[in-house]
């Protein structure tokens, strides 16, 4: 449980993270992720062809009336986005990695990148950046993957936890 002071710090720090969705297909997932990002002051980048219209009623329902309070942007060109983003610290979330998301070190300004619900992140991107790949471990091998919104929530809160702990540790040593 966070104190009010920790929550305030978390909100300030989390603005420096970006959640990226490559070609999301399911409106309610994107709406829920947008709401999650908005609640934490995290930017949301939607990249490539979307499997829905931004006016979709299910997208709006999942995001409720918060869309005006969410820092989000749509980048139509996947290649251009990758050229710019991959100059930063980024994490590719995929089922095709053996490294757990908890083994990664998250810092301010990081990008948490997730693929579409149906195809994930393209193999060409994964092969070009194997050191940036990580996964959410699952015990049951019969389950191929988790829901995209659930996955974003799990990884986002781990990144926020690490950033907050790091920031709190630095502040403690300043006094």
Predicted regions and their residues:
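RNA substrate-binding interface of SAM-dependent RNA methyltransferases
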Residues: 2-94, 160
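Active-site helix-initiating loop/hinge in glycosyltransferases
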Residues: 29, 145-147
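Short, structured coil segments at secondary-structure junctions
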Residues: 40, 128-130
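Short glycine-rich anion-binding loops that position phosphate/pyrophosphate groups of nucleotides
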Residues: 95-98, 116-119
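Glycine-rich, Arg-bearing micro-motifs that act as flexible, cationic patches
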Residues: 139-145
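Conserved small/polar residues in nucleotide/adenosyl-binding loops
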Residues: 168-175
């Amino acid at each position: 449980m966070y104190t009010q002071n920790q929550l305030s710090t978390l909100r300030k720090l989390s603005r420096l993270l970006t959640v990226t969705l490559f070609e999301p297909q399911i409106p309610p997932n994107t709406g829920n992720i947008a709401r999650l990002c908005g609640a934490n002051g995290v930017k949301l980048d939607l990249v490539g062809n979307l499997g829905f219209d931004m006016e979709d009623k299910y997208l709006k329902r999942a995001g409720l009336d918060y869309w005006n309070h969410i820092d989000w942007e749509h980048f139509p060109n996947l290649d251009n986005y990758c050229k710019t983003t991959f100059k930063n610290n980024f994490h590719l979330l995929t089922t095709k990695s053996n490294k757990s998301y908890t083994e990664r070190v998250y810092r301010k300004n990081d990008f948490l990148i997730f693929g579409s619900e149906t195809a994930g992140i393209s193999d060409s991107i994964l092969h070009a950046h194997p050191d940036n790949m990580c996964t959410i471990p699952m015990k049951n091998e019969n389950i191929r993957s988790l829901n995209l919104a659930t996955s974003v929530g799990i990884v986002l809160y781990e990144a926020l936890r690490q950033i907050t702990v790091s920031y709190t540790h630095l502040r403690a040593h300043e006094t």
